[in-house]
């Protein structure tokens, strides 16, 4: 039985809304002025990718800082898994090895890594089509991850309950890392080549 993880999905959908149309908007006005001054499409594309990364990192930094301050104010700040929160986000019970530090590391790191990948995919698709299609494409990719348990369905790699740190029979961490790295590199190269050929 598949239980739709609404809380997880809301977190995953936050980044696409933050990315939305920045790259497309920057193909006009000030962005074009910068492109003319630097005279390098590769440098321009790299600057967009850097902005993309910083936006994702900022979103998660705010989330983690908020959680830190909340825990500090309530006097229950710790690096232990919050059972109630874990079950709300994942719709799964806390594993027997909840004290395993790798579960906590996975929960903190992999959602960020996956968001970095989907943000770049979104920006690249948006550049070739339009911002709405780019945003809907990565949202659909995440939704499909709920129903298809495969590392190529990118959202699976941000779900600790589908990883080998939660259950040894599930997606291996190295598979998740490999998929994220390969997809990021391929999309980065495709985006750069596409932008070099784009008529602005």
Predicted regions and their residues:
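Juxtamembrane "helix-exit" motif on the non-cytosolic side of transmembrane helices
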Residues: 149-167
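Junction motif at the cytosolic side of a transmembrane helix
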Residues: 182-200
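Residue-level recognition of pore/gate-forming positions within transmembrane alpha-helices
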Residues: 51-52, 139-143, 184
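Structural signal for membrane-spanning alpha-helices in multi-pass inner-membrane proteins
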Residues: 59, 63, 67, 71, ...
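Transmembrane helix boundary and interhelical loop/hinge segments in multi-pass membrane proteins
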Residues: 19-37, 41
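Secretory targeting signals
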Residues: 1-22, 46-127, 131, 162-180
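Central hydrophobic cores of alpha-helical transmembrane segments
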Residues: 130-146
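Cytoplasmic membrane-interface regions of multi-pass membrane proteins
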Residues: 31, 130, 197-200
